[in-house]
UniProtKB/Swiss-Prot annotation:
Pfam families from the UniProt entry: PTS_EIIA_1, PTS_EIIB, PTS_EIIC
Protein name (database record): PTS system glucoside-specific EIICBA component
Free-text domain note: The EIIC domain forms the PTS system translocation channel and contains the specific substrate-binding site.
Record domain PTS EIIB type-1: where: 438-519
PTS EIIC type-1 domain residues: 3-427
GO cellular component: plasma membrane
Enzyme class per UniProt: transferase
First-listed, main subcellular location of the protein, grouped into a coarse class: membrane
All copies of domain PTS EIIA type-1, residue ranges: 560-664
Record membrane topology: Multi-pass membrane protein
PROSITE patterns: PTS_EIIA_TYPE_1 (PS51093), PTS_EIIA_TYPE_1_HIS (PS00371), PTS_EIIB_TYPE_1 (PS51098), PTS_EIIB_TYPE_1_CYS (PS01035), PTS_EIIC_TYPE_1 (PS51103)
Organism field: Staphylococcus aureus (strain NCTC 8325 / PS 47)
Key words of the record: Cell membrane, Kinase, Membrane, Phosphotransferase system, Sugar transport, Transferase, Transmembrane, Transmembrane helix, Transport
Amino acid sequence: MFKKLFGQLQRIGKALMLPVAILPAAGILLAFGNAMHNEQLVEIAPWLKNDIIVMISSVMEAAGQVVFDNLPLLFAVGTALGLAGGDGVAALAALVGYLIMNATMGKVLHITIDDIFSYAKGAKELSQAAKEPAHALVLGIPTLQTGVFGGIIMGALAAWCYNKFYNITLPPFLGFFAGKRFVPIVTSVVAIATGVLLSFAWPPIQDGLNSLSNFLLNKNLTLTTFIFGIIERSLIPFGLHHIFYSPFWFEFGSYTNHAGELVRGDQRIWMAQLKDGVPFTAGAFTTGKYPFMMFGLPAAAFAIYKNARPERKKVVGGLMLSAGLTAFLTGITEPLEFSFLFVAPVLYGIHVLLAGTSFLVMHLLGVKIGMTFSGGFIDYILYGLLNWDRSHALLVIPVGIVYAIVYYFLFDFAIRKFKLKTPGREDEETEIRNSSVAKLPFDVLDAMGGKENIKHLDACITRLRVEVVDKSKVDVAGIKALGASGVLEVGNNMQAIFGPKSDQIKHDMAKIMSGEITKPSETTVTEEMSDEPVHVEALGTTDIYAPGIGQIIPLSEVPDQVFAGKMMGDGVGFIPEKGEIVAPFDGTVKTIFPTKHAIGLESESGVEVLIHIGIDTVKLNGEGFESLINVDEKVTQGQPLMKVNLAYLKAHAPSIVTPMIITNLENKELVIEDVQDADPGKLIMTVK
């Protein structure tokens, strides 16, 4: 029972990430728009009073605020998309269902505009009226105030309708409404029933939520923040933290803004107070992340590096630097946390307790900083320093330094005292399977027991989430050998921690299971015998030339942590100046990705090179690329492989920087030439 529930909660937690992922963009617009007419900033920069600047700042602020004002709708659509595998029909059904559900509740309970705005008749303008907290005006519909819970409920129901009826067949005369077209229709019926049910069920639930909110926030908020911090971090390994913090961020607490509108939830209240220019009272459930994410965990990473064996320090140092910097800048801590969670749980226990105290200390000091993504330096600048006079954000720095010291010495002591096997202190090297980029999803699928053993497949920012039919068929050791930093098992639910490449692995696995991608050709053990003698060329030195005209940069400067952190192998970055990618050596085309954004080559001496054209170009679905070669085709150095529309890539991709990665460097030495300007005849690397 628990294991099945855990699997369902996993899916819901993943689904909630989609609407939450929209908030950073909205938060940036709101923060910058508000900052541009901040009184202190205007005094320093009087040019901000310019009418055009004022208009721009007002537009930015309004554009950001409208997202926070309509979070329930976004949660309805996002939850449906997440639980229905990303199908747009489910999103449309959720949108229709959400509107119908609210309209139904309004009609059943006879809710009017006057019921929503208690003092509307006496106010000069409707926007100045005080809003009645039990009711809401949702996209112009007077209805019950169900908040994000209402959106999540309708999104989940729309996804259920999609999964149940997307392939339904109807009689020929109703054939037009069969299949996916039937989903919004049946969702509408479900929405009416849900609206009627909630009309009577939601008011007592609403009273209960308000009572719980008042108890948590008014009885002992200091203790509540401490417990919140502990539980939120404790749920990270299970991927259920999104479910836990959502009520605190989006429902608990209330504030009436200057427009007379009731705003609920710690994060939403903070954003409303940012816009209103009033002292912050919200932020108790966000501020505590900044000290341990920006200072504590990077210090823990240094302690892990310091205790690594001398021969492992270089490798561990690179991993810890990358993970620590990611935590500091963005607040994405999973790559670092999972590096010690499975091998040294005692360290994670220490981390959880310190995270709880961080929330407590920030609350006691009166520091109130909002966030939209996570507690990294970027959010600290936007929501802390830009409003330092109201947020008291400067206190984060001395507190963070103290946490860095505490984290470092506690981790250092625990590692040495208990002889913990943190990265770099393992008894022996774990065998890592040589799985090229093209083969990795195939190998992971095999390790999971094959496609017949996959019941549900999903992924989030850092982990591959799989529900399997038979857990005994899963090769956990094999998954770790393929590069997973850990594997969490709860019943038949598996979470493999592959870091930022998890989503791409999931994407490729889904295509493999549907037959869209076939396995790269391999030499089998039982090859057809030939009368001709087989010539086996000895492995030797391989010269690798530039793949076109452009600039060569160090791999560390590639704007992607997976490549820059050498998670896929070593190499260089190439910035193309002409729209043609050529072969860097004589060899064979082993892989052309379906989206044409990456090519896998093998030299005559067996060196495998991946040319990944641009960053995040997989999302372009092949637009801007024209392949000039085929898989298994022999190519010569300088032969054109791909035509690239650089103008299109610059407009639609984060970067045109093209990583060139050697994916099988085991027992080989890579020599990188000191080259900046490149052309197809210039040597840039040698593998010995």
